[in-house]
Regions:
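Solvent-exposed loop/turn and edge beta-strand elements of beta-rich ligand-binding domains
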Residues: 1-372
């Protein structure tokens, strides 16, 4: 009896269609259509069309078409779009068809230069299409896509492997490109305007407000920190960020840069992408109170000021634009000696003291007269 049951089970197994996914270790899911996705990072609106190709490497000849994906100049930030892969309506044979899928270009093409760059995806995928005889007709029974290289062209194990090919946000059949333009270069990064020559991507200047009564040291160095949050797909090295004070230029490699400025000095940053969020902080300094005038993307001047002496001044959460970006810091000086009396108020203190002394002398004089 047991032998009969086993034989029946084997017969049913042979009669059922074999899942082509079984070779991949998954017999529960089959996919019969595929979607490719494209992510475009840009802080500057660009009309761009990206193209892809599926090169056949195994199986009878059967061409697969991957549609272009287009972004408009209003698609800024990080945007993702998907397109459905087109397979032949008729297949020559049953079996496995293997394709290598890559990105082939962008239209219009952008030439990488000193102030702009299009970072193209180097990702590569293997797409295996399984065709079976279903109802006396050859049709797709399963599609499996594996990533073999990531967007940087690397084959790291944690960034490769089988990917989702559905028409959902889980889709991993993805190519990511980034367009980056240097801040401050204007609308034509190939030919930056005169403001860029003067201010670069961002200019931070320093001065001390002085008058005849002040004894401020104009050779004193004030400490600053500039923090950067770079747009998606970029970092300090993408356009070679640098900081220049006078004849000294330093490369920036991280997300923070410290520097010192004296009265009348400035630091000019270059190589910072449009869309970089900045925070500029002047450290608290005894006897000094800070204020700043801020212009971002050549917009309206904004004032930032501290209300007390010896407090840090921070200009925060500003996003660099294509046009002029400046932070002009001014310090007001008031000397506070160990007595705690501010020198600018000393004359008033002396006047009060003299009045008090005169009052005491008058009272003493009156007492002596009364005693007589």
């Amino acid at each position: 009896m047991l032998a009969i049951v086993a034989a029946g089970a084997m017969t049913m197994g042979l009669a059922m269609p074999t899942s082509v996914f079984a070779a991949e270790g998954d017999t529960t899911t089959t996919v019969k259509e595929a979607y490719i996705s494209k992510t475009f990072n840009t802080e500057v609106g660009k009309d761009e069309t990206f193209s892809f190709t599926a090169t056949q490497v195994a199986g009878s000849t059967a061409n697969v078409t991957i549609p272009n994906i287009t972004f408009a100049d209003t698609d800024t930030g990080s945007k993702t779009k998907r397109a459905k892969v087109t397979f032949p309506e008729e297949w020559p044979d049953a079996g496995k068809y293997e394709y290598t899928v890559t990105e082939t270009g962008a239209t219009p093409a952008i030439t990488d230069g000193e102030h702009q760059k299009m970072i193209m995806s180097q990702a590569k995928y293997t797409m295996d299409v399984y065709v079976s005889n279903v109802g006396n007709k050859l049709a797709i029974s399963n599609i499996i896509v594996n990533k073999t290289k990531d967007d940087d062209g690397n084959t790291a194990q944690d960034t490769t492997g089988k990917v989702d090919i559905s028409n959902t946000d889980k889709n991993g059949f993805n190519f990511t490109n980034t367009y980056v333009q240097e801040a401050g270069t204007g609308t034509d990064p190939v030919n930056p305007g005169p403001d860029y020559t003067t201010y670069g991507s961002l200019d931070v200047s320093k001065k001390i407000k002085t008058d005849a009564a002040d004894t401020a040291d104009t050779n004193k160095e004030f400490e600053f920190t500039a923090d950067f949050t770079f747009p998606n797909g970029t970092d300090a090295t993408t356009l070679g960020a640098k900081a220049t004070i006078g004849d000294s230029t330093i490369s920036i490699t991280g997300t923070s840069h410290t520097f010192k400025l004296k009265h009348g000095q400035n630091v000019k940053f270059t190589g910072l992408p449009v869309g970089t969020k900045i925070s500029v902080t002047e450290s608290a300094t005894p006897n000094y109170k800070g204020s700043a005038e801020v212009i971002i993307n050549n917009g309206t001047k904004e004032a930032v000021a501290e209300t007390k002496y010896n407090e840090a001044l921070t200009v925060s959460d500003k996003t660099l634009g294509q046009n002029k970006n400046t932070v002009d810091v001014t310090n007001t000086y008031n000397y506070v000696p160990t007595t705690g009396i501010i020198m600018n108020t000393l004359p008033y203190v002396l006047m009060i003291a003299l009045c008090g002394a005169a009052l005491m002398a008058f009272v003493a004089f009156k007492r002596r007269r009364l005693q007589k």
